[in-house]
């Protein structure tokens, strides 16, 4: 499953909001430095979709706020 994700780093609280078009807006506490925001994003998405962190891959947008995420599900 692929999801478009808009990341908002340096937020006061962690939050995942699903948009009408099926994309996600994810608020992260971590700054976008040394991959910390990406690590936090993967951890949050793994918890939301109940999959191991190793099943989540950032396909594009590694250094961008707009990302394409691949989530491997066991379905």
From Swiss-Prot:
Region annotation (Disordered) maps to 1-32
A cellular component annotation (GO) from this entry: cytoplasm
**UniProt cross-references to InterPro entries, sorted A to Z:** DUF167, YggU-like_sf
**Pfam families referenced in this protein's UniProt entry, alphabetically:** DUF167
The UniProt entry's sequence similarity note says: Belongs to the UPF0235 family.
NCBIfam families according to UniProt = DUF167 family protein (TIGR00251)
In Swiss-Prot or TrEMBL terms, this protein is called UPF0235 protein asl3196
Question: Per the UniProt entry, what species is this protein from, by scientific name?
Answer: Nostoc sp. (strain PCC 7120 / SAG 25.82 / UTEX 2576)
């Amino acid at each position: 499953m692929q999801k478009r994700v808009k990341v908002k780093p340096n937020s006061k609280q962690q939050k995942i909001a699903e948009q009408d078009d099926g994309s996600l807006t994810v608020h992260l506490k971590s700054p976008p430095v040394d991959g910390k925001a990406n690590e936090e994003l993967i951890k949050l998405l793994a918890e939301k979709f109940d999959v191991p962190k190793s099943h989540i891959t950032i396909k594009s947008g590694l250094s961008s706020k707009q990302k394409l995420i691949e989530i491997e599900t066991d379905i």
